[in-house]
């Protein structure tokens, strides 16, 4: 039986490719998709979800828009990374369907209530919607199998010296998720910076030759430009968000450790930092499965294989 998942995202080039990977995988049953502000404004990330599902002919999947700002902070967006639309690069189809007439939290709660088995929540943006769900529906915690997030890192940042973008946008929400008691799987920069897509990988995807693989290649063309900045020291573009889906499909591609993780919400230099107790110094019981390494070639091969689904 396919694993039921609920995807909360802020597309975003890598979010879009995570959607592509999830919907090409019969092992997964995507019950609903909710959008969050983050990589772009809430209006644009919602539109990008609708555009991607129109492209993939999956307008049957219910979609809802989430919180317009973080729990306690002003919204920060990453338009310098993802462009004016949030998915700059390819020409995407106009949406042919509308979102549900409800909030993201309402759609999440409905999805959990109606599922016969616990649902895995995959969250590839700021954790605002997930935190609101957890706080407003404690009775539904038992219906959540795990929460797989793209966010955080052990000791490095990509938005500040200490913080990864998704966590930095709403650290209070991320702290709620990590301390919820629900199993958390963390795909942080330690692993996603190793999941780089090189130019030759993009050309491999383009050569598959179907409309979706072509769009993915064009998304990567744009995404690579930002990551050419020599400060990163990258060969390609790190494909952060699809690591969450790839872990669900092929966990053997990833090396993980069980550790306690907390989120810094007040530090002068470290707001948004995920504090990973790697050496068990706090005495706290592990609350997260933390990805630390990936078989890059296996990750690329998985993407290439699943893109053929859209022929």
UniProtKB/Swiss-Prot annotation:
Which positions, given as ranges, span the membrane? Answer: none
Alphabetized GO MF terms = purine nucleosidase activity; uridine nucleosidase activity
Broadest EC class assigned to this enzyme:
hydrolase
Active site, per annotation: 240
The biological process GO terms on file are: nucleobase-containing small molecule interconversion; purine nucleoside catabolic process; pyrimidine nucleobase metabolic process
In terms of Gene3D superfamilies, this protein maps to: Ribonucleoside hydrolase-like
Pfam families in the record: IU_nuc_hydro
Which E.C. number(s) belong to this protein? 3.2.-.-
- Alphabetical keyword list: Glycosidase, Hydrolase
GO CC entries: cytosol
Q: Which family does it belong to?
A: Belongs to the IUNH family. RihA subfamily.
Show the NCBIfam families listed in the entry. Answer: PRK10443.1
The free-text function statement in the UniProt record for this protein reads:
Hydrolyzes with equal efficiency cytidine or uridine to ribose and cytosine or uracil, respectively.
- Protein name, per record: Pyrimidine-specific ribonucleoside hydrolase RihA
